[in-house]
Amino acid sequence: MEKRMELLPGVTLTAVQTEKFKTGCFSINFFRPLRREEAAMNALIPSVLLRGSEGCPDLRAIAARLDELYGASAGTLIRKKGEVQMTGFYADFIEDALAGEPVFAPMMDFLGELLLRPRLENGAFLAEYVESEKRNLANAIASRVNDKRTYATGQLVKTMCAGAAYAVPRLGELEDVEPITPEGLYAQYRKVLAESRVELFYMGRKSAEDVAEQLRRVLRELPRAAAFDAVGTEKQRAGGDVRRVEERMDVTQGKLSMGFTTGCTAGEAEYPALLVLNTVFGGGITSKLFTKVREELSLCYYAMSSIEKNKGVMIVSSGVE
C-alpha cells in the first residue's frame, strides 16, 4: 500500500508498506534547480556530511554505529532528472521484527544527525573533510572520459543543449570544484536545507503513519524558508542547423552519438506514441537499429536509442570500429 503525505512545508513522504522483504529502505532527496554555479557544491555536500557528525565524528565511528544497527548501510545520492539536481542519502536496514528490537527509529535518528548536526570547525565544515571529498569529486569528474560511451553522450548533451541548464553535468564541472571553501560549502548547505523541496521515500513493514511520526520528530529542526526554489525542466526546442562535433582519441572503437529533439515530454498526449516509436527505432533487440544496422549490415558494434522524457530529446548511441 502506497501513501503520500506532507510532513513539513515542502517536505513530502512516499511510504510503501509491504511484508515482502526482510530489510527496509529509506531515502531523502533535496531537489535543486540544475545550475552550474552550485552543481559541484550540491554534489559535494552529501559526501562531506557522511564523513562525520557531532556524535560520530569520523568514518570509524560511523561504521561502528552502522554495525550496531545490525550491519545497516548508508550512502549518498546524486542524480539528475531533466533540469533538476537531486542530492541526499539512502539507507538499508533490517526490519524491527527480525532484529527483535527497534532498528528503524535509531536508524532515522542516525540519518537525522548526519544531516542536521554535521561536524563543524569555526562555524564551517571541517576543512580536512572538505578537501578530501573535493579530491574524490574531482577524480570522479575527471574519470568520466574513461567511459567513452557515457562521455560521448555527455559531450553530445553539452553541444545540443548549450546554454540550457540541462547541459550541466550531474556532478558539476571540474573547474568549479577547486574554488570551493569550507565556509562557502557550509553556506550552500544551509541554503539547500532551507530552500529546497524535499522528497522522502520509505519501503518496509511499518505503516505510513508510524514512519511519518518518526520523521516529524527527527526532522523537527530542519529549517524551512517561506518559499522554495522552483524546479522544473524546459522542453528542448529545435536548434536549426545540424551541429557536428568531433574529438579525436587513441581508441580501438569510435563512439557516434546523435541527438534529436522530439517536441514531446512525459505527460503529453503524444508521449505513449513516442515510446512505441523509440522501441521500434532503437529501444531493444527487435528494433531497426539492432536488427538492420548492427545485425544485418554489421555497421557497428552496438546501436541503440533512448528518450529523455523530461527534456524532449532522443539520443542515439553507437560504437563503430
Which residues does each PLM region occupy?
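His/Glu-rich zincin catalytic helix
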Residues: M1-A72, E173, Y186-K292
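M16 family metallopeptidases and their MPP-like homologs
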Residues: T14-V16, K22-N42, L59-E113, R149-G172, ...
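Short, polar/flexible loop-turn hinges at active-site or ligand-entry regions and domain interfaces
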Residues: G52-G55, D96-L98, R117-L126
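Acidic/histidine-enriched alpha-helical segments
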Residues: A63, R117-I141, D229-R237
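A common structural junction motif
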Residues: M108-L120, R217-A226
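Flexible, glycine/proline-enriched loop segments at strand-loop-helix junctions
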Residues: E121-F125, A140-S143, L171-V177, F201-Y202
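An alpha-helix initiation/capping motif
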Residues: E128-E131, R135, T150, G154, ...
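Short acidic/His-enriched helical or mixed secondary-structure segments at domain edges of catalytic enzymes
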Residues: N136-Y151, E296
